[in-house]
Amino acid sequence: MNEDLFYDRLHQRCPGKYLLEELETSKSNDVLHASRFVCEMELVQKTNAYYCKTIVKMLLDHEWIFAKAFTIVNDGEDEIEIYDYLYEKYIKLLSTGKPDPMMKDVVRYRFDEDVKIKIEETPNLISAASTTGFRTWEAALYMGDFLIHKPLQELAPVQGQDDGKKKLNVLEVGAGTGIVSLVILQKYHEFVNKMYVTDGDSNLVETQLKRNFELNNEVRENEPDIKLQRLWWGSDRVPEDIDLVVGADVTYDPTILPDLCECLAECLALDRCKLCLLSATIRSESTVQLFSQECNKLGLKCTIVTSTEYDANNEIRAMKALQFKPLIAPIRIYKITKQ
């Protein structure tokens, strides 16, 4: 394990037990800079003091494993004794209890060395205020992982722009925390002209989504045009200039499937849009069958592109790299096109 990966694990809230296993099995002895270690631990404490406390205790209890994985060097003006720092930190955090379920955290998800997404979320909250968009769900992480390994420009045809470059206009439906759109923008910003990031909850769009895009605001040349807006399926019209639709965990509620499928059909009726990609956690086969039936009624073809059921490597990678625990149910990615 190198130093960058170690900090990425901390900012993604990797459980201490799993982090310890990675340190113990690390075959390299990488350099760890004491001054950076202190800065990173302070950042972790600032956003999640209880998690910081559990990591500090784990490192103190297994000092020899930490020492085996890293060679600690002092590169600042003042020499820092790491274990003295950890001991003092643990004493300060001793009274810190488990966080309230409503507590917000800023989690930084690592999809690869170059794509790391910060998300402000409430990870212990399933739903509130009639929305499930306050936390990042497994299907969104799986979709992000899929898009990292399957080049966006190979997934959908693109239209030539006036400057001769070929770029996509992408629509995300049911964006929630916005992590799928953020992955696309970080990984493929040079291939994206316009990104519509939408959700049916106006309040969520104006608060949660806006906040997460602010957290990941990196100024680049020729930055895509990003639009955060409400899209209520069956009521609001879809943008007419889109090439690709993406969505994650939007098929969980059977009562909204007719409106969702109508929205997808409206998108695919546009001249430019040829493909919708949806990731779905398979909590109920009956809901999946209903989704397929609704698609069929509207002349849409629904095909499984990949699934954790059929590809053990996908499941292992998604579990180990993105959430560090078994999946609650299989996840599939569907391709929806016109029949």
Curated annotation (Swiss-Prot):
EC top class named in words: transferase
One protein family per Pfam: Methyltransf_16
Record-listed E.C. numbers: 2.1.1.-
Keywords tagged on the record: Cytoplasm, Methyltransferase, Phosphoprotein, S-adenosyl-L-methionine, Transferase
InterPro entries tied to this protein: Methyltransf_16, SAM-dependent_MTases_sf
Residues the record lists as binding S-adenosyl-L-methionine: 137, 174-176, 199, 233, 248
Disruption phenotype annotation: Increases sensitivity to antibiotics that target translation and decreases translational fidelity.
MF terms in GO: protein-lysine N-methyltransferase activity
Compartments reported by the entry: Cytoplasm
Gene Ontology BP term (one): peptidyl-lysine trimethylation
Top-level taxon in the UniProt lineage: Eukaryota
Function, in words: S-adenosyl-L-methionine-dependent protein-lysine N-methyltransferase that mono-, di- and trimethylates elongation factor 2 (EFT1/EFT2) at 'Lys-509'.
Any further remark recorded for this protein: Present with 1550 molecules/cell in log phase SD medium.
Protein name: Protein-lysine N-methyltransferase EFM3
Originating gene: EFM3
